[in-house]
Amino acid sequence: MGVKALGLLRKPKTVSLKQACAAVGQGQLMMIYQKLFFEYHKTAAQVLLTFDVVSSDERRHNAINTFNELLQLDVVPVVNENDTVGIDELDDSVTFGDNDTLSAIVASMIHADLLIILTDIDGLYTDDPHTHADAKLIHVVEEIDDNIKSMAKGAMSSYGTGGMSTKIAAARIATNSNTDMAIVS
């Protein structure tokens, strides 16, 4: 969203410009979420995390407490990586930083029953449905093996950092924590 708001024609290459775009885009994103949830008489809260929430027991504990309080207050937490300070997602050479993985980590932290990841594809296909008309939708995956991982290869959007492979990696994190996961459009 920040790329578009700043009038840039393509995804930035430098980390500092990506951070600036993230700072602009995050505010716009929250305005949209606030408006949408307000229509359902719900309050949305912005929770920006960095991946050190996994490595620091204190930060993890604080994050869990925040999520628990928000949920007790019937507030919908809108979670995103804090891309203005956490640059893993912005550095194309790093593969760990993406919102799919972050969502699975959060679902695991709060012991969620279900994680739903939204995407522009209906779910996992035998091949990339954007380029292969004969690709078939896989409705249920019981186990993530090498065959499933190979199906997850493929393109991502021009502005995205994920793709189906990050969703499959997120599914592994979620299911290892007894959280079911759905990939839907």
Give residue spans per PLM region.
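Nucleotide/pyrophosphate-binding catalytic subdomain
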Residues: 1-180
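Conserved glycine-bearing catalytic or ligand-binding loops at nucleotide- and phosphate-handling centers
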Residues: 182-184
